[in-house]
Amino acid sequence: MPRRRRASRRIRRRRRPRVSRRRRGGRRRRR
């Protein structure tokens, strides 16, 4: 069980840098 929780945390950290790149295109979506 604890091993699965650690793996889920690693996936969340990888999603954070991808979201920062989406923020650049998010400005166009707000307009």
Swiss-Prot record:
GO terms for cellular component: nucleosome; nucleus. Disulfide bonds: none annotated. Keywords: Chromosome, Developmental protein, Differentiation, DNA condensation, DNA-binding, Nucleosome core, Nucleus, Spermatogenesis. Coiled coil: none annotated. It is found in: Nucleus; Chromosome. The keyword NAD does not apply. This is Protamine PTP4. One of its GO terms (molecular function) is DNA binding. Protamines substitute for histones in the chromatin of sperm during the haploid phase of spermatogenesis. They compact sperm DNA into a highly condensed, stable and inactive complex. Residues 1-31 are annotated as: Disordered. It comes from Oncorhynchus mykiss. GO terms for biological process: cell differentiation; chromosome condensation; spermatogenesis.
